């Protein structure tokens, strides 16, 4: 599979990233294992998850996706074959959210335990936390990089202005810097990324890992725009065309 460098200083990764938000949701543990096996056999070894996946499923508490991936690592012994990305900062319940130093320190240990690994290749801020100074957040990430628990850091769901401010903060204080951005971007919804984020991505040479890149399946053709009955999640894409 074709690979390219992730951002200005990241690892070389496949041009496709395998998202794990359905693990523990629409895919069972056994189905997830089969998917991961098939992906690696095809050369797709870039896997992205988050601590919050799949907390929204009734009966789940969060961390299910990470835990299933961790079990797969334990079963196959293929941790070193995978470029592993996960995220921190989204709502996990009981006050567990945000990007304060203390919470990042707690959350990374929880993720490492669930993933059954000693390090995370790409640790991403899942969304901006305007209540926490950027220097505090980036300082916490910098500590994790220096300790070897995290190799690279990235951002997701930031505005262009805040992303630029974060990158300048890292430069000013000599802290670990975001090498990648995970934005909502596809051929249906382009405006926010192209007008606000793309200039920052180009200026700082960030890698981009878009989510909803197929518009939740709409761009595959599986959802007909004129279909009489649509799931609520499908309505948004059909109205955008």
Segments and roles (model prediction):
Residues 1-81, 146:
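N-terminal binding-site loop/beta-alpha segment at the start of enzyme catalytic domains
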Residues 6, 18, 32, 47, ...:
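Conserved, mostly hydrophobic/aromatic
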Residues 11-16, 43-45, 78-82, 116-121, ...:
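Short, well-ordered coil/turn segments that N-cap beta-strands
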Residues 19-30, 91-105, 127-132:
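Active-site mouth loops of central-metabolism enzymes
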Residues 27-40, 98-115, 163-168:
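Short, acidic/polar
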Residues 31, 62-68, 101, 105, ...:
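Charged helix-capping and loop-helix junction motifs
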Residues 52-53, 75-99:
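Structural motif corresponding to the early beta-alpha repeats
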Residues 128, 132-241:
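Beta/alpha (TIM)-barrel catalytic core signal, keyed to glycine-rich beta->alpha loops juxtaposed to Asp/Glu
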């Amino acid at each position: 599979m074709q690979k390219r460098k992730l951002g200005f200083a990241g690892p070389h990764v496949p041009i496709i990233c395998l998202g794990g938000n359905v693990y523990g949701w629409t895919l069972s543990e056994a189905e997830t294992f089969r998917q991961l096996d098939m992906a690696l056999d095809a050369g797709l070894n870039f896997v992205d998850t988050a601590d919050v996946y799949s907390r929204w499923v009734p009966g789940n508490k969060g961390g299910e996706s990470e835990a299933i991936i961790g079990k797969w690592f334990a079963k196959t012994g293929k941790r070193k074959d995978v470029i592993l990305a996960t995220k921190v900062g989204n709502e996990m319940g009981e006050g567990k959210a945000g990007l304060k130093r203390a919470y990042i320190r707690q959350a990374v240990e929880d993720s490492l335990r669930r993933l059954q690994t000693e390090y995370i290749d790409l640790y991403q801020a899942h969304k901006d936390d305007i209540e926490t100074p950027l220097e505090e957040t980036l300082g916490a990430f910098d500590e994790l990089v220096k300790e070897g628990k995290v190799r690279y850091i990235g951002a997701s769901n930031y505005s262009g202005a805040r992303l630029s401010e974060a990158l300048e903060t890292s430069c000013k204080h000599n802290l670990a810097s975001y090498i990648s951005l995970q934005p909502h971007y596809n051929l249906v919804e382009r405006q926010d990324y192209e007008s606000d984020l793309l200039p920052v991505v180009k200026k700082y040479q960030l890698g981009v890992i878009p989510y909803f890149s197929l518009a939740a399946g709409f761009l595959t053709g599986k959802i007909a725009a004129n279909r009489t009955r649509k799931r609520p999640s499908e309505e948004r894409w059909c109205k955008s065309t």
